[in-house]
Amino acid sequence: MAEYINPNALGDLEENVVSINRVTKVVKGGRRLRFSALVIVGDRNGHVGFGTGKAQEVPEAIRKAVEDAKRHLIKVPTVGTTIPHQVLGVDGGGKVLLKPASEGSGVAAGGSTRPIMELAGIPDVTAKSLGSSTAVNVVRATFDGLKNLKEAKVVAALRGVSLGE
């Protein structure tokens, strides 16, 4: 598991509300209405996290989601302005293919993947969502892919070879 990243040490974190859903629970007396929020936070410098929150009011659900996102920050390795290598992130029915892109090509990603890349500070990347299109599944799959990224020096150390080979 990745080590904990203290959100207070990072300074100013930006927030992006990806989705707000109205959810209901059917009880004997009728329906109970609540709101579910999915939020991305990041410092545009390699740190990004996502969280979910649920409450009877939208602002409270967003506040809970932001707190959850700050508790689940990850560090994203980069090479220049892009990611080190191609990776497939999977979570449930959601699959997201992340590919490095040449400098200046921008973020070619749709839906909930774009704000993740922007708040992580990755200006050049290509992403394709395969499988489930649900916002939560796509976000979880994207984060799975970002967690599986490895820098060249880490891979070289694992293989026991020097970086020049």
UniProtKB/Swiss-Prot annotation:
GO terms for cellular component: small ribosomal subunit. Keywords: Ribonucleoprotein, Ribosomal protein, RNA-binding, rRNA-binding. It holds the Pfam family Ribosomal_S5. GO terms for molecular function: rRNA binding; structural constituent of ribosome. The keyword RNA-binding applies. GO terms for biological process: translation. Residues 13-76 form the S5 DRBM domain. It comes from the Bacteria. Gene3D superfamilies: 3.30.160.20, 3.30.230.10. With S4 and S12 plays an important role in translational accuracy. Located at the back of the 30S subunit body where it stabilizes the conformation of the head with respect to the body. The N-terminal domain interacts with the head of the 30S subunit; the C-terminal domain interacts with the body and contacts protein S4. The interaction surface between S4 and S5 is involved in control of translational fidelity. NCBIfam families: rpsE_bact. Part of the 30S ribosomal subunit. Contacts proteins S4 and S8. Belongs to the universal ribosomal protein uS5 family. HAMAP family: Ribosomal_uS5_B. This is Small ribosomal subunit protein uS5. It comes from Oenococcus oeni (strain ATCC BAA-331 / PSU-1).
